[in-house]
Curated annotation (Swiss-Prot):
InterPro entries: TMEM258/Ost5
Mode of membrane association: Multi-pass membrane protein
Regions crossing the membrane: 17-37, 59-79
Principal subcellular localization: membrane
Subcellular location: Membrane; Endoplasmic reticulum; Cytoplasm
One GO term of the biological process aspect: response to endoplasmic reticulum stress
A Pfam family reported for this protein in Swiss-Prot or TrEMBL: Ost5
Subunit structure: Component of the oligosaccharyltransferase (OST) complex.
Superkingdom in the source lineage: Eukaryota
PANTHER family for the chain: TRANSMEMBRANE PROTEIN 258
Protein name according to UniProt: Dolichyl-diphosphooligosaccharide--protein glycosyltransferase subunit TMEM258
């Protein structure tokens, strides 16, 4: 395989939007994280729903995970 015949890889996400994605994703993740903590503190053991807890925690962790991923890309740690 010749080097000249290869096509250069381009990222599907423009590096100029890494800061915006970081802030938006982390903000959404922090919202769901705060909602989870408020739900845990204000509900009694009789009114808690484990499926609702798992759903909120899953959504929060997904947004926080992708937010941290784009934060690392933003600061130059390419993972």
């Amino acid at each position: 395989m010749e080097l000249e015949a290869m096509t250069r890889y381009t990222s599907p996400v423009n590096p100029a939007v890494f800061p915006h994605l970081t802030v938006v994703l982390l903000a959404i993740g922090m919202f769901f994280k705060a909602w989870f903590f408020v739900y845990e503190v204000t509900s009694t053991k009789y009114t808690r729903d484990v499926y609702k807890e798992l759903l909120i925690a899953l959504v929060a962790s997904l947004f926080m995970g992708f937010g941290v991923h784009f934060l690392l890309l933003w600061v130059g740690i390419f993972v």
